[in-house]
Design a protein with these regions (language model features):
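N-terminal type II signal-anchor transmembrane helix
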Residues: 3-43
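Positively charged, low-complexity/disordered segments
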Residues: 221-224, 228
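Substrate-recognition/specificity elements adjacent to catalytic centers across diverse enzyme folds
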Residues: 26-216, 220
Length: 228
């Protein structure tokens, strides 16, 4: 009986030790995924030194001697603070969320692919002037520098949330930045569903004169100048 109890205690003790080791490893990886705002690092892609100063609210203030380095620093800071949001939003606009979240994301993926935002964003890059293109390229270079740093220094996954999902840190491109701006515009256009419903209703009306009933603007008889 004593031996049985000793065996049970050993199993329980071993399980506790193993659990503590696993928790310590997880904690270490999560801790490595949190950006270090106090460090000094050397990264490819900049001409002169950049300084990113964080205030008490961790808001970045970027100091650089030229515009390209400034946009580089902005991309780097965004990748430090918003990596999870940036990666998920890029998958959203590409219509690829179901690759990570499964079939429940199919409707949103289908909607995004119908809008074809990402292809339009790639075309939008070509339509930009040289100054804007350089800014987009420098911003993307800053993000990619952070990706390189994460992989080179084994900084976990770059964001704690990415430990839960196997999302690869693919290189960031100028089209990605434009695509996210277009996605934000779509999210801000919540009235589009009402516009579609109104258009379908107008098409279905048997009497064209009933259009006035659904118009957002009340159309009245023109006013003569002498009546103003």
């Amino acid at each position: 009986m004593v031996r049985v109890l000793q065996l049970i205690f050993r199993i329980i003790g071993g399980s506790l030790v193993l659990s503590l080791i696993v928790l310590a490893i997880i904690f270490y990886i999560v801790l490595r995924s949190i950006p270090d705002y106090e460090k000094t690092t050397e990264l490819p892609g900049i001409v002169e030194p950049i300084e990113i100063v964080r205030d008490t609210a961790n808001v970045p203030h970027i100091y650089a001697n030229n515009d390209n380095d400034l946009y580089f620093g902005l991309g780097y800071a965004h990748a430090q603070d918003r990596l999870w949001q940036m990666v998920v939003n890029r998958l959203t606009v590409q219509g690829r969320l179901s690759e990570i979240f499964g079939k429940q994301a199919f409707p949103l993926d289908d909607f995004m692919r119908r809008l074809d935002i990402y292809s339009l964003s790639q075309k939008s890059v070509d339509a930009q002037d040289n100054i804007t293109k350089k800014a987009l390229e420098a911003y993307a270079a800053g993000i990619n520098a952070r990706f390189l740093e994460i992989n080179r220094m084994s900084l976990g996954r770059g964001a704690p949330e990415l430990l839960l999902y196997n999302i690869p840190l693919a290189a960031w491109h100028p089209a990605d930045s434009i695509a996210l701006l277009k996605l934000f515009a779509v999210n801000s256009s919540s009235h589009y569903a009402k516009e579609i419903l109104r258009s379908r209703t107008l098409i279905a009306l048997p009497d064209p004169k009933r259009v006035i009933d659904l118009s957002l603007i009340h159309i009245s008889e023109p006013t003569r100048p002498d009546e103003i």
